[in-house]
Regions:
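Catalytic cores of eukaryotic secretory-pathway lumenal/extracellular enzymes that build
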Residues: 1-194
Length: 194
């Protein structure tokens, strides 16, 4: 089961780290394929990377960038025959065996919904040492599910980009939601085709 990983990046120095984190922490590395729209001054070179054949990479000068939605739409055009679609921000750190977990979770959700989508705000992390690629996960002791909700304090107020936030929930129930995060979105690829 192949997973297409869609990444739209705008001058993000963490993009190579995100790609490496997804690849090294995947259980089935051979089933990953990356579609990357990199809006950055410096073009990345994957010619010597062991995953070079698993990357479709488009470099765009940042002065020609047209925003995150445009870049994400372009990344989606790189989708081929992969069964699953994962869209993440270009500054994401992955957990061990994340690929197996997400596929199993989607299969569980299919018992309740025909076309499930997993979406969330990923847990934050801080950069301890960028040169040595040392990061520390925030909220590491918090194993609860964070449910996306509208933030009443920010809804429709000037100066706020997002009106959503994640709230911890101890519930193990599966709930249908109405909010989506473009920074982490996983589903079957037919969602993009539809």
């Amino acid at each position: 089961m192949k997973i297409f990983i869609s990444i739209a990046s705008y001058q993000d120095l963490l993009l190579p780290i995100t790609i490496n984190s997804a690849y090294t922490n995947a259980k089935f590395k051979e089933n990953l394929r990356f579609g990357i729209i990199d809006q950055c001054k410096v073009k990345l070179d994957f010619s010597k990377a062991k995953l070079k054949d698993q990357i479709s990479y488009v470099h765009i000068d940042p002065k020609d960038a047209r925003g995150p939605c445009w870049a994400r739409a372009n990344a989606q055009t790189l989708l081929q025959d992969e069964e699953y679609f994962l869209q993440v921000d270009s500054h994401t750190v992955f957990e061990k065996d994340w690929d197996e977990y997400l596929i199993q979770y989607i299969q569980t959700l299919k018992k309740y919904s025909k076309n499930p989508v997993i979406s969330a705000y990923p847990r934050g992390f801080e950069i301890v040492d960028f040169e040595k690629k040392v990061f520390r996960k925030l909220q590491e002791e918090d194993h609860s599910t964070h449910v996306m909700v509208l933030d009443r304090e920010k809804t429709f107020k000037d100066g706020y980009f997002s009106m959503q936030k994640g709230l911890p929930s101890a519930s193990k129930e599966i709930y249908k939601g109405f909010l989506i995060s473009a920074g982490f979105l996983f589903s079957e690829s037919k969602m993009i085709e539809d």
